[in-house]
């Protein structure tokens, strides 16, 4: 079974939900023509990454109706991203829409960038996994991927593929980290980032890092340049990935969880203390 992800590398417009939705539908159609199973958008694509949006102006699930209808019509999935209504403040969220137009999952970004303007958002409280057409999908949004715990929890919850809506620059260390997340969790990873100078580099990595003869293989399935806008594709061989996961020693095979209690401490020590504004 091949699970094909269409990765959109493009920047959307701020506060232009209708126009951005038309762009999404255009690329959903192109993704379907190219036999993709799902279209992955960059972070906050529907609304734009406009942190002046208040909770009243943020979108809700009802605003996804046209995209759900198009997903059903085309038979292609979508990871839709937007600033959405939270309990008191907006959330940075992703919705996984299935091929029949159903919303399979909403995930709100847990690791909001509290060192920057994103501190005004309401963070999510859990990592989530859903079943998409027989493939277990987890979501990390941008800064989530800087914390290995994010991908590890998704793996523990059964994720086989982790999709990453993203919006940032200086991508080289982030690419290395995403490849490592794929390797250490034995999960496929795909990331969509807006194009631009020092940006872009949308990517995908297989968890398969060596062959049956223990020879290293390049696990890069996709690595876009910085400035090209448009769709890129990554094909995950789920049969090969599942066989690899059944025999190799990463993931949840030999963890020593009794030694991990310090991971649950919320104490922050030097040199990691920061002022909280």
Tell where the protein language model's regions lie, with residue ranges.
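Short, charged, solvent-exposed linker or helix-capping segments at domain edges/interfaces
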Residues: 17, 59-62, 105, 213-216, ...
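Residue-level signal for short segments within beta-strands and strand-turn junctions
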Residues: 9, 98, 206-208
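Cys-nucleophile CN-hydrolase/nitrilase-fold catalytic domain and related Cys-dependent amidase chemistry
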Residues: 13, 17-21, 25-100, 106, ...
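CN hydrolase (nitrilase-like) catalytic-core segments centered on the catalytic cysteine
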Residues: 61-79, 146-233
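Structural motif
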Residues: 37-38, 137, 161
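Active-site catalytic loop in hydrolytic enzyme cores
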Residues: 85-157, 166, 172-180, 187, ...
């Amino acid at each position: 079974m091949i699970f094909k992800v269409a990765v959109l590398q493009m920047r959307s417009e701020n506060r232009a939900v209708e126009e951005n939705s038309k762009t999404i539908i255009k690329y959903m159609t192109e993704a379907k023509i190219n036999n993709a199973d799902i279209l992955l958008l960059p972070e906050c694509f529907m609304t734009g990454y406009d942190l002046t949006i208040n909770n009243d102006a943020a979108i809700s699930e009802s605003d996804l109706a046209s995209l759900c209808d198009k997903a059903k019509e085309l038979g292609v999935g979508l990871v839709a991203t937007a600033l959405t209504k939270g309990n008191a403040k907006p959330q940075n969220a992703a919705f996984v829409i299935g091929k029949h137009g159903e919303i399979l999952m909403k995930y709100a970004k847990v690791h909001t960038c509290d060192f920057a303007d994103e501190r005004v958002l309401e963070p999510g409280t859990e990592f989530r996994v859903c079943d998409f057409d027989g493939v277990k999908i987890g979501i990390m949004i941008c800064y989530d991927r800087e914390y290995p715990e994010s991908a590890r929890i998704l793996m523990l919850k059964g994720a086989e593929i982790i999709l990453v809506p993203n919006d940032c620059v200086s991508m080289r260390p982030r690419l290395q980290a995403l490849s490592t997340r794929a390797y250490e969790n034995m999960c496929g990873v795909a990331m969509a980032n807006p194009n631009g100078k020092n940006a872009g580099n949308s990517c995908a990595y297989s968890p398969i890092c060596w062959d049956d003869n223990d020879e290293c293989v390049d696990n890069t399935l996709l690595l876009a340049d910085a400035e090209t806008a448009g769709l890129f594709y990554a094909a995950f061989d789920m049969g090969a990935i599942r066989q690899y996961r059944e025999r190799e020693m990463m993931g949840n095979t030999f963890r020593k969880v009794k030694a991990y209690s310090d991971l649950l401490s919320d104490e922050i020590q030097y040199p990691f203390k920061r002022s909280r504004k």
